[in-house]
């Protein structure tokens, strides 16, 4: 069985789009095939500078896959392609 994809969500508190992406990832995680973690960009000045105006940003296996919005079907398609 292949290793699950690694998904990282870069977000910040008070970001409603981030909350939407988190809800989608939590819902889809039960299907398997990926694990995910969240990084608060405001906890690291370098990340804050890099992603300040782009959150939420989603990386799949180290490659940027989405920023701002992420639809469930697009995520599943991207997950399968990586």
Region annotations inferred by a language model:
Residues 1-27:
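Local sequence-structure signature of Cys/Sec-based thiol-disulfide redox active-site neighborhoods
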Residues 20, 46, 74-75:
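Residue-level recognition of oxygen-bearing side chains
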Residues 29-33:
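Short helix-capping segments at alpha-helix termini
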Residues 34-45:
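Thiol-based oxidoreductase modules, predominantly thioredoxin-like and allied folds used
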Residues 52-58:
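Structural micro-motif
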Residues 60-82:
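Non-catalytic, surface beta->alpha helical segment in thiol-disulfide oxidoreductase systems
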């Amino acid at each position: 069985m292949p290793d699950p994809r690694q998904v990282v969500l870069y977000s910040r508190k008070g970001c409603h789009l981030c909350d939407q992406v988190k809800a989608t990832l939590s819902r889809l995680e039960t299907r398997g095939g990926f694990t995910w973690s969240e990084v608060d960009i405001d906890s690291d000045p370098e990340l804050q500078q890099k992603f300040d105006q782009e959150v939420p940003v989603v990386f799949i296996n180290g490659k940027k896959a989405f920023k701002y919005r992420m639809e469930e079907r697009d995520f599943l398609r991207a997950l399968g392609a990586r």
